[in-house]
């Protein structure tokens, strides 16, 4: 799993929001709504869906309720807009700053490092990107087979050879999950259905 971040940039408004959070206070909806936002496509888990759920959980509002939100076609363009002050906040996957650290100053024109210029002002629930699932409807599936598959996959991820095999998926290993671990994913799927109406 990974998380999405709500990242405030170097603009005056971005720094104002970061200062509030860094002082230990909660941001209000009006404070968030006063910013210019950079969002990704409505199908993006980290750049739209999970941050929208975060807003719903905290404020009872969604991204569509923001007064000023522009869609970016890539995380690079979102960060370029953030660096230039065109937007005050962006929504992105947790490692985005590390992935674009070199480009922040060299290509996006920022004056300081990405770590000096940006602040995390929100963190979403975990996003479960990849899963191994079994069918509840299969006549061949039973608890013993389910446990054996689970154990085998976890064991594969615990060996050097297995890690090499699963690295093609950028996986580092597997762990047991419960149905309740995916409650937020169910909420995300509901939101996606609503957005596509």
Predicted regions and their residues:
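Hydrophobic residues within well-ordered alpha-helices
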Residues: 32, 82-83
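Short helix-initiation/N-cap motifs at beta->coil->alpha
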Residues: 62-80
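An extracytoplasmic/periplasmic, membrane-proximal ligand-sensing/linker region
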Residues: 140-197
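A ligand-binding cleft/hinge motif common to bilobed small-molecule-binding domains
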Residues: 54-57, 83-84, 88-115
């Amino acid at each position: 799993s990974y998380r999405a971040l709500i990242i405030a940039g170097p603009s005056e408004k971005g720094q104002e929001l970061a200062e509030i959070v860094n002082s230990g206070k909660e941001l209000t909806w009006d404070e968030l709504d006063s910013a210019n936002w950079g969002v990704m496509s409505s199908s993006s888990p980290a750049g739209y869906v999970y941050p929208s759920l975060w807003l719903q959980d905290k404020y009872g509002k969604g991204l569509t309720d923001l007064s000023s939100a522009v869609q970016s076609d890539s995380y690079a363009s979102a960060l370029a807009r953030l660096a230039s002050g065109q937007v005050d906040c962006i929504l992105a996957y947790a490692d985005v700053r590390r992935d674009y650290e070199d480009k922040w100053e060299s290509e996006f024109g920022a004056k300081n490092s990405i770590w000096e210029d940006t602040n995390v002002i929100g963190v979403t629930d975990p996003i479960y990107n990849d899963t191994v699932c079994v069918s509840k409807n299969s006549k061949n599936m039973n608890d013993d087979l389910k446990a054996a598959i689970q154990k085998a996959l976890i064991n594969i991820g615990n060996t050097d050879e297995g890690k090499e095999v699963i690295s093609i998926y950028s996986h580092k290993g597997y762990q047991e999950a419960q149905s309740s671990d995916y409650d937020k994913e169910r909420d995300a799927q509901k939101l996606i259905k609503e957005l596509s109406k």
